[in-house]
Amino acid sequence: MRKIKLIAVVGPTAVGKTALGIELAKTFNGEIISGDSQQVYQKLDIGTAKASKEEQEQAYHHLIDVREVNENYSVYDFVKEAKVAIDTIISKGKIPIIVGGTGLYLQSLFEGYHLGGEVNQETLKAYREKLESLSDEDLFEKLTEQSIVIPQVNRRRAIRALELAKFGNDLQNSESPYDVLLIGLNDDRQVLYDRINRRVDLMIDNGLLDEAKWLYDNYPSVQASRGIGYKELFPYFSKQIPLEEAVDKLKQNTRRFAKRQLTWFRNRMNVEFIMVGEENYQQKIKRKVSDFLSSK
């Protein structure tokens, strides 16, 4: 069966994924699927760096504002709903363009996971990270202990097999129905960190404090409140730290998050990054997309 072609724009926060995704959607008749675990929440617009109303008018966005703030959202939900969105976009004769930085969600979708029951996102993530920390010798020893045989011995297949063994029918693996063009965006580290710092300042100017205070007053313990952009401000609202310290912590956590995102995409999804500082980088990406879509 012919695989469905997907374009995926990935990379660290603040690198410019949203703008590129919209440009590709306009150029190649596409619609965007958000691959971000926080942008699903209604009323949380600033802290999640959600595409603005003006940006959403330029290209239709799926999986934005699909949950109330007090609802949970998991990798199970994302895979299920992203597949529906992909089918919807394809039925219109358009190209699905997935834009986001939540690596676990994207990897689970692209690598053929389908879920027979709900797997707790944090449980899956913790188990995968535990396996990733093992040496090759220890990892393959675990395969032997559980009598797991895989046709080709490499770390990715080994980890996938152990996940399937642990979670059973809740996390099944089959051949992916998708042919994915992964476009990884990156920038010089200091340039990226400076952009992150400026974006946090802009978020504060645009009303992040009011948005976070509303969450603090109404839903301080829900899953959404644990996201970067909100949890750092809660100690300020409870008068434990001054605002300047809270904002500095938010910038620091965002920079660290960007570093973790890069590590995930490099090590777990084999993404080759394009530097946004390169001359004509968007034109290079468009040529790559055009070649991908025209190939059989």
From Swiss-Prot:
Cross-referenced InterPro entries: Dimethylallyltransferase, IPT, P-loop_NTPase
Record: residues binding substrate: 13-18
Any one GO molecular-function label of the UniProt entry: ATP binding
Named cofactor requirement(s): Mg(2+)
Alphabetically ordered keywords of this record: ATP-binding, Magnesium, Nucleotide-binding, Transferase, tRNA processing
Domain of life: Bacteria
BP GO terms, sorted: tRNA modification
UniProt cross-references to Gene3D superfamilies, sorted A to Z: P-loop containing nucleotide triphosphate hydrolases
Ligand binding (ATP): 11-18
Annotated site location: Interaction with substrate tRNA: 102, 128
Record bears the keyword Iron: no
Region described as Interaction with substrate tRNA: spans on this chain: 36-39
Catalytic activities: adenosine(37) in tRNA + dimethylallyl diphosphate = N(6)-dimethylallyladenosine(37) in tRNA + diphosphate
Enzyme Commission designation: 2.5.1.75
Membership in a protein family: Belongs to the IPP transferase family.
Quaternary structure and partners: Monomer.
Function (record text): Catalyzes the transfer of a dimethylallyl group onto the adenine at position 37 in tRNAs that read codons beginning with uridine, leading to the formation of N6-(dimethylallyl)adenosine (i(6)A).
Protein name per its UniProtKB record: tRNA dimethylallyltransferase
Source organism (scientific name): Streptococcus agalactiae serotype III (strain NEM316)
Organism ancestry: Bacteria, Bacillati, Bacillota, Bacilli, Lactobacillales
